[in-house]
Amino acid sequence: LKKYFKGKTVITAEDPNLRSEKDLRSIGFQDVRRLPHSKSINIGDIKVTFYNFGLFLTDSAIVIEAGGTTILNANDAKIAGWPLKKIVRDHGPIDFALRSHSSANTRVCYKIPGDKSFVSDDREHYFRSFKLFMDAVKPKFAVPFASNHCHLNDDVIKFNSYISNPIELRDYVE
């Protein structure tokens, strides 16, 4: 990034966690601007809006509007219900919606003995979540992508079975 965008402004979501800003500054970006939740900035003919979800470990989604095309990149943010409806109402119709369909976290690797409320992730949960999200957004094009993990230690290699691919997602949705 720093090779191609040296001296350029970088815009990131404003959230309580300063990690993104610190990481960007650590690789040499000097002009890092944090955009508050639901506020927009125009960069030439491109309008950018961040939506932040969570209190301490913020998930962010970004809406990019340009030339009559609207892109919603939800990444792995857990947006649903009224907040998602508001985004679609404020920016819709959505042409391209991007969202993760596969988990990349450690929750599958542990159990909490005696805690009946603890639920480990399952592959179908992420497929179902992707479908519900796209049903709510109704984009012209749904773009699945996978967060990823790769467990290499013998004690946890079995958890690689939680990885899913877009073909499996398609089969689930159909």
Where do the language-model regions lie?
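Active-site environment of divalent metal-dependent phosphoester hydrolases
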Residues: L1, N17-S20, K39-N42, F56-T58, ...
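Active-site HxH/HxHxD metal-binding segment of metal-dependent hydrolases
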Residues: L1-P36
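Short, charged N-terminal helix-start/capping segments
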Residues: K2-K6, G67-I79, V108-V119
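Alpha-helix C-cap/termination motif
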Residues: K3-Y4, I27, E65, D90, ...
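A general structural motif
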Residues: K6-K8, G68, P93-I94, P139
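Structural beta-sheet core signal
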Residues: V10-T12, L72-N73, R99, P144
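Core dinuclear metal-dependent hydrolase active-site scaffold
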Residues: R34-N105
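Cap/insert and terminal regions of metallo-dependent hydrolase folds
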Residues: G81-V173
